[in-house]
């Protein structure tokens, strides 16, 4: 039986506020699609994570008398902890502040720049 590769991702959730029902809903719907594809024998990868850049995060941190990094760490942890509580089967959780994410983005942008695009 031939397997097909499938890649599923939620939006990377913005950490300016705590997770809510909409985040849970999106994660569950994506999880259903990923599980179905695994059941069909497809090589399936399911990614989710958090976007930790932007003025709204700085503003939320300032309102709570903390740094944007400390605030993002706290809220990102809430998003990550939401997943097992909902039995979400994601393969990875990425944070836009993580070194591995930064390295990949730099590599992609360098390739684009070098190709003249």
Give the ranges of each region predicted by the language model:
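N-terminal, positively charged nucleic-acid-binding surface of large information/translation enzymes
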Residues: 1-117
